[in-house]
C-alpha cells in the first residue's frame, strides 16, 4: 500500500496528518495498523474507535500478535471501549501467551477487561461521597483547595475499576465545592512548601550538580535501592514471556514452571566480568544494576568470572574484581566460573551438531571479519563429519586457527553463524591442560545464565545485537531461557577505560599503575578517596535507560562531595605554610583547644589542636597589595583564626633578603569578642607535623582523548602536565593517627584521603576533590 494511501487511512482512524506521517516511520506499528484495518473490514471506525485501534497497535507485543483480529473485533464491537480496557486485554493475553496457540477463554477475558460493566453516575457520586466522609474530610477542611484530590481519585478508582476517570474527577470536584464553597483569596495563593521554611537548627543545604542531575533526570534516583524499587520495571520471575522480543516455544511453559520450582520465585542476577583487567567506573554501574536489582527484590546475585580467554587472565584480576565488588558493599550469592561448566558446554555443542545446528568450519579469523564475510563453504557439511572433526579439535589433533565450531544462526545485525568454539593451546588457570578448545562469549554467556537460573540477564546496549542468538541457543537446546535486558553504557569524559590503553600509560610511565588516582579504575578511585557510597549514588543518579551516557568527572565529584561533606571529619592543614609570630600571645604557654570534627554538628565528636605563639597560615591568605574585594590578611586588614577566638593584625613583614619573598609575619592579636569583626577567618596550624600531599587534576586535556578529530596526535599526546603535583604541607597533630583510606576535610581546601604509600613516619594524602567553589570568595 502506497504511503499516501496509508496516511489517508491512518487519518481516517482519527490521527492528524502529522501524526499519521510520524506513525508511518515506525515499521512495527504500521504493520500492526495495516493488519488491524484488514481485520476491521468495513466496520465504522468513528467515535474514538479508530484511536483505540491505534493505541492497541502501539502496545501490541510479538507474543500476542496472533490475537490482533480478536482485539480489533472487541474494539469495533465496543466491548473494549477505552484505553484502560484495551490495556487490560493486552495484559491478559500476554499472560496466556507463554503457550503457543493458547486457547483464549473469552469469558475470562471479558471479565478481566470489565466488558459490559457499566458504572453509573449515581454509583460514582455515592462512592466519592463515602470516600471523602471516611478518609478525606478533615484534611480537606484543613488544607481546602490546596489538598491533592488525586488521592481521592485513586481511592475511588480502586473500588470502581471501570469508572470513567473524567466522570470521577468531575464528581470529586462537585463534592469538594459543596464541602468548601467557592475559592477564597487564600485558596488562590500558591502553597508554601514545608521544606521551604528556614530552619535555624540546620545549615542551608548545598545544591550540587549531582543533586541537580538526580532531580532533573526522571529515570534517576538518589540511591540504588530507590532506583531499583521505583524506577526500574522488569518482568517478575517466571513471567519471561512478557518481555519484549522474548521467544516462546512449545516448551516455554514447562521450562518456566521448572525454573520457578528451582528458584522459589526469587530474582537471580549475575555480574559476569572477564578476569583480564581492572574494573572501572563503567563496571560500577553494571555491579550496581545487577547486585542492586537483586537486593531491592530480595533476590540473589552471582559473581561469575567469564574465564574463557586463558591467555589474558591473571590471578590478580580475579582477586581485584572480588575486592572491588565487596568494596562497593555487595556480597555475591555465589562466586562461579564459566569454566565450571566446560564439560556441560561441550556436551551441548555435540547436541547442536547432532541437530544440524552447528558445524566445523575452516575459514580463517580474518575471513570472518568485516560487514559481509563470505558464507562458509562448510555450512552444510555432514553431521557425522562435524562430530568427528569437533572431537579431533578437542583432542588437539587440529592446529590452532585451522578450525572453529560455528552455530547456524543469523544475528540481528545480519552477522551469520557466530563462532562457538575455537582452538587455543594454552593452559587454563583452573582446568590446566584438560581443554584445548574454549567456548566464545556468544556461546557461553546465555548457557551459563540458564544453568544458574538467571531471571534477568542485565547487560550494556552493545550486547543487544546478541540477544537473538542468546534466545536461539537456549531454545535450540530446549533449556530454560532467561531474559536479556540492555541498558546504556556509562562513559566518562576526560578519561580512558580501555585496558590496553591504560597498560600503555603504565608502560610509558605516565601513570604509576592501575590504581593511579588520575585513572577511573575502581582501585584508582578508592585510592584517591572516593567513598563507595558516592560511586553507588552516582550510578543511581544516572538511571537505567537505553541511552548511552557520557558525563564529566565533575558530576561524579559532586556525588563524592555530597557524601564526604557529612562523613569526613575536619582538620586544619596549610599546603603552602607562611610563618606567623604572635608577639602578644595571650597565654603563658601553648594551649590545647577542643575543636569539633563537624562544626555544623558538634555532637559528632571533637579533637584537640595546639595553639602557640608561632603559627602557620597559607601563603595565599596574605597579600602585600590586596585587590578590591580581598577579605583576608593584608598590611591594613586583620583576619580571624578559625577555632582560636583570636583576630590578628600585621605589625611587621619579614622578607628573604635574597628573593624578596615574604617569609614571616609579626602580628598582634585581639580576642575575637573584643576586636572588630574580620571579613574572613582562615585556617592555621601550630607545632605542626609534615605531610606529603599529592594534588591531582584531570589527566587529559580534551574531553575525548581517543577521538582523532579532537586529538590528532593520539591519547598519549593529550596528557596534562599539571595532572599531578606534590607539596609538603603542615598539619595539626590530630592527623598523626590517620590510617590508610581514612578521609578528612582539610578546612577551606578540600577533601583528602590517606594514601597506601603512608608509613609510620611518613604520612601521604591524596586530594580527593576540592570544596564547592564559593562565588565571590576572595
Swiss-Prot record:
Record has ATP-binding as a keyword: yes
Residues the record lists as binding L-glutamine: 306, 441
GO cellular component: aminoacyl-tRNA synthetase multienzyme complex; cytoplasm; cytosol
Ligand binding (ATP): 274-276, 280-286, 460, 489-490, 497-499
Disordered, as annotated region: 188-219
Compositionally biased tracts (Basic and acidic residues): 188-205
A molecular function (GO) term: ATP binding
Short sequence motif named 'HIGH' region, residue ranges: 273-283
Motif 'KMSKS' region, residue range(s) on this chain: 496-500
Entry EC no(s): 6.1.1.18
Reaction it catalyzes: tRNA(Gln) + L-glutamine + ATP = L-glutaminyl-tRNA(Gln) + AMP + diphosphate
Keywords (A to Z) from UniProt: Aminoacyl-tRNA synthetase, ATP-binding, Ligase, Nucleotide-binding, Protein biosynthesis
Enzyme class: ligase
Biological process annotations from GO: dendrite morphogenesis; glutaminyl-tRNA aminoacylation
Annotated NCBIfam families: glnS
Entry's family note: Belongs to the class-I aminoacyl-tRNA synthetase family.
Record-given protein name: Probable glutamine--tRNA ligase
Name of the encoding gene: GlnRS
